[in-house]
From Swiss-Prot:
Gene3D superfamilies: alpha/beta hydrolase. This is Carboxylesterase 1. It catalyses: a carboxylic ester + H2O = an alcohol + a carboxylate + H(+). Hydrolyzes carboxylic ester bonds with relatively broad substrate specificity. It holds the Pfam family Abhydrolase_2.
Length: 218
């Protein structure tokens, strides 16, 4: 497996953001974003993992970086749950690696765009047991959230920021909103923010993420 990019901060690291890219992208996709955020988050390490390359059914079996296979797009995503679980294990391993460097998990954040965000949702609220600094979910959905979703006390305490485009044609706004509602209904401190955009990232969005992180790392 390709090793993640690791961006060391200007000061000794006392916090970490693990940031997952989307379908067909790679570990370099959010490198400029991480570099921009580190200009103000001076003691925050960024870890940018790389999804394995695998055939993706909705793209005619074409091989590309993908955290899991997507078998159908509508009305809801049909995915490989086995591959999602494997990717979630990759993320929990990264959390534990950062923990071994001396960073408390209450200062470790999981962020993900699109498919990467779906892995982050599953990891934080279905797999990881323990504190986390927070979750940042960009233009994404939660394929394993349903009405039977049950959260532990520590999972309920994970602050979450959901950001989505009003005109997203890839992951419809309603899909992101559904994940937000699932968490809100279970007592999670979750924030929903919309932007006049499609399936993309805007400078204002990155500014808002930086402010949200800074507030939690004071």
């Amino acid at each position: 497996m390709t090793e993640p990019l690791i961006l060391q901060p200007a000061k000794p690291a006392d916090a970490c953001v693990i940031w997952l890219h989307g379908l067909g992208a790679d570990r370099y996709d959010f490198l400029p974003v991480a570099e921009a955020l580190q200009e103000t988050l001076l003691s925050t390490r960024f870890v940018l993992p790389q999804a394995p390359t695998r055939p993706v059914t909705i793209n005619g079996g074409y091989e590309m970086p993908s955290w899991y296979d997507i078998k159908a797009m509508s009305p809801a995503r049909s995915i490989s749950l086995e591959e999602l679980e494997t990717s979630a294990k990759t993320v929990t391993d990264l959390i534990e690696t950062q923990q071994r460097t001396g960073i408390d998990t209450s200062r470790i954040f999981l962020a993900g765009f699109s498919q990467g965000g779906a892995v982050v949702f599953h990891t934080a609220f279905k797999k990881w047991e323990g504190p986390l600094g927070g979750v940042i979910a960009l233009s994404t959905y939660a394929p394993t959230f349903d009405n039977d979703l049950q959260l532990s006390a520590s999972q309920q305490r994970i602050p979450t920021l959901c950001l989505h485009g009003q005109y997203d044609e890839v992951v419809q706004n309603a899909m992101g909103r559904s994940a937000y509602e699932h968490l809100k209904g279970r007592g999670v401190t979750v924030t929903w923010q919309e932007y006049p955009m499609g399936h993309e990232v805007l400078p204002q969005e990155i500014h808002d993420i930086g402010a949200w992180l800074a507030e939690r790392l004071r």
